[in-house]
Amino acid sequence: MSFGLRFVMALILGALTADMFSLRGREEDKLRIESLKPGRQVCLIEPMLLPVALAMGMVFFLLWGGVQALGRFAANLWLLFFQIGVYYALLLLVLAPLRRAVSARACAALWLVPGLLYFLVWIVMDDDSRPLAVLTLPKDLFEPMFAVWLLGFLGLLVWQMVSHLQFRRLLLRDAVPERDEALLEQWHAELRRHGVRRDIPVVVSRQVSTPLTVGCFLRTMRLVLPGRHYSREELELIFCHELRHIVRRDTRTKLFLGFCTALCWFNPLCWIARRRASDDLELSCDEAVLEDADEATRRRYAELLLQHGASGRGYTTCLSGAAQTLRYRLSHVMKPAKRLSGGLLVGAAAFALTATAGTLSLADAAGPARELLFEGQTQTPCVQRVFVSSWREDMRLSRKVFGFDEAALTEFLGSLRIREIYAGAQGRELPFGTRCLDIDYEIPGQEGLIRLTLSDGVLTADLPDDGRGEIACLVEEEGP
């Protein structure tokens, strides 16, 4: 994909994301005066799109091209994971001023923006654009490092799933259905007001000290209450808080954040980012529930938070949270400040991620070009033809070269120090007017030609019977 096309696509996606964020916000604001339409989505994006797209991509490339194609796809995905890790690290650095400047809803949405990269999974392969940065990783080391990463990823993913299921089983093992008719009537009324189509059972469990919702899908969700009495006003605040999580699909957002943490398990910043993101999800619901609330309601809500200090585990959402975040939430509840909506910021983040996705490269260690081009040939390749080419508007103009020294040309090409690009941006895209040197070698007794193109620090090679297609290499320096 050319840089121009990528830039335009990023602009469109950024604008659509900002508009979608504002649209979802307006939909959610309707809850102040009316009910949501049944099934209405108010989250920025379905959190599980990226994990599903990655799984489908792996299956497709495995079936289409076998283990070799899957390996190339995995190498390209590594760069995508690296970008997500960098994004979360940068977001952590600016999180404190962002929380003071923009709404908690925008801060929560920023953690979900990498999910928009799901459609780029299919176009990260063999991108022709020039790389913004090149990461050097010898190909001999990639396979063992990938194996270590894969073991860590799968191990952490399984551990998270098992931990969640064990916690869910612990919560529901001794839970009993709620029997209070007035409470259930109030709960069902709030379900209808929030546009939730399916009934979500309410249970009481001795294992919890704070109200929470467990389950990633409506059919598996349960609202779990501790065994204590609540007034009607307290129940309204509790139900509104938990239903905001439900209509925003926050339990699946936590599943997505856990998936991203597993992808970047070697990066400690991603573990910190996961905790900060969970805090922002709670702050965002506090903000939504208490919008336009009077001081008495805010005080009642703050008392509920203080009475229910607990830490959420697994893929759950809970009214209160860990002690280290409670002080910050109480400050926001009792002293609300005017903040920007943050829609433009969310759109700008989507633009930046899309514009830079696929612009990194993984390259092999530097070595002489002859090792890649000529070694292993049973016969000495002979130059068949040489052209000098350049792009002018929509045409490629070529001029054949005569009278060259074949031995000197071959020695020059073989002495170039190159780094083979085996993942990410290939650098084949050339600006208009760039001149290229095209050399075709024929191998006696063998079909096919070795086709080389040297231009602007990039050497591309199409080797017969290689099976990898056109190979792009970065030229570090000329030979002696």
What does each model-identified segment do?
Residues T17-F21:
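Basic/polar, acidic-poor N-terminal "presequence/leader" segments
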Residues S2, G358-A365, A461:
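Charged interaction patches that mediate protein-protein contacts
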Residues M1-L16, G71-F81:
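Hydrophobic transmembrane alpha-helical segments in integral membrane proteins
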Residues D127-D128, L452:
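Intrinsically disordered/low-complexity terminal segments and short unstructured peptides
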Residues S2, R26, K37, P138, ...:
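Serine/threonine-rich low-complexity intrinsically disordered regions
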Residues S22-A53, F60-D127, V134-L362:
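Membrane-embedded and juxtamembrane structural elements of multi-pass membrane proteins
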Residues A366-P480:
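Function-determining sites in protein domains
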